Each structure stands twice: as C-alpha cells, then as structure tokens.
Amino acid sequence: MFFICNVGPFRSWKESKIFWKMEDGSPNDIQLILVTATDSSLPSGNSNQDKFCKFGFVCLSTSFERGVESDNGRDWNFCLIIISSWAVLPVPGGPVMYSESDLCSEIAFAKKFITCSYSAVLAGNAPSLLFKLTSSDDFCKSAFVLKKIDCEPNCSFSGDDSGVTSVNCNFFLFKGRGGVAGASSNRFLLIRLVGVIGIADMNVYGTIDENSAAQCSEYSKIVLPENIPLLYK
C-alpha cells in the first residue's frame, strides 16, 4: 500500500483500486488513499526530490464532447494516477538540454518495466467520444508543470451509457520549477499515466498552465513506505 496525496479536498470520493501488472504478468493490487498536503512539507530544494517524486498524483478538469451537450454542459472531473521517474539528473553550472528523441528513448526504456489496465466507473452519463484538456488560470500551480510530448499517442477513452470508461496509457513530461525556496530547476520529471478515476463534484483547481510561474499552497506528492520496491529507476 502507498499513500497518494491530493492537491485539495474532495466533496465526494469513492474508494477505488488500481491494478498494476508487472512485466512477469503477476498482478499487484495497490490500494489508493487520498490525503491533503501543503507546501510546508515540500522539500525546500532538490536534495530530497528523488525519493519525493518517485510516484505522483495530479488532478485535472476535463471535458468530454459527445456531439450534444449533456448534464447541462458540465465538465467531468478526473484524477490522473501516474508513476514517475527522473528523466534527467541535475548538472551543476547550468540547465540540462534534453532532446525529444532522448526523452522518447527514456520512455521506451520505461515501457519495458510496466504495463497498465484500469477502468473507471462514472456517475451519471458516461463520456464516450473525445478527451481533451481545457485551459484554466486557477490550476494549482505546483513546483512542476505538465507538458505533452509527441513520442506517445494522445490519451484515448472508450465507454458507453452504462457508465464504464476505459483509458489507454500515456506519457507526459514534468519540467521542474524548483522547490518552495525558488531555486531554479534543471530536471525533467518523466511520468506515465496509468489510470483515471472519475469523481463527481470535486473541488477543481483547473488544468495545466505551462506559462504560469506561480507556486501553489497545496500540491500533489506521494509518501512511500520504505519497503515498497520501485518499478524502475
């Protein structure tokens, strides 16, 4: 079991499990537990972030298009469960330049170690056609920003009116802004989307804003017991 910290409180939450399938095919059930955290517990520099960021969690506001508006045009809110790995180590004296081809090679390496399968049961009408990230200025501005990279296909969802929706795996890239001390960061955090949980009536912070430099008072982090093995390094 490990603990996933959320960027903010939920008004409603239904307990869910995500099933990890290791390379040898053996399933590992991992129970998700959501808690809140503030930036007072964020490391002030990069010294602890290797352990700090091995796993992560971020919430987005998403909207689905079905050809016609349903549920008064309301957006569905989802939480993306991710597994992360540092793609670039810091280099003293300047930022690290890491090409897209290098990142894609890193992704290809990571894909050898884990596959995923997850289905989310949604309340009400099931979104079915198109998944897109919306733009919002009120996104919780954490120490990292999320950026899509081109060496993996877009997230795709499938579902029907029964309320069951599946999601394919994908990769994203976090570029570090530094810790709460404000130090510049020259690391990239590579994360893999491994599942989606549908949550109704969630307090929404908005979606990814790559251009914002603001810090946030609440953010996402993971607390791992020492005996949990890393899936890849």
Swiss-Prot record:
The chain crosses the membrane at residues 78-98, 113-133, 188-208. It is a multi-pass membrane protein. GO terms for cellular component: membrane. Disulfide bonds: none annotated. Keywords: Membrane, Transmembrane, Transmembrane helix. This is Putative uncharacterized protein YJL195C. Partially overlaps CDC6. It is found in: Membrane. The keyword Secreted does not apply.
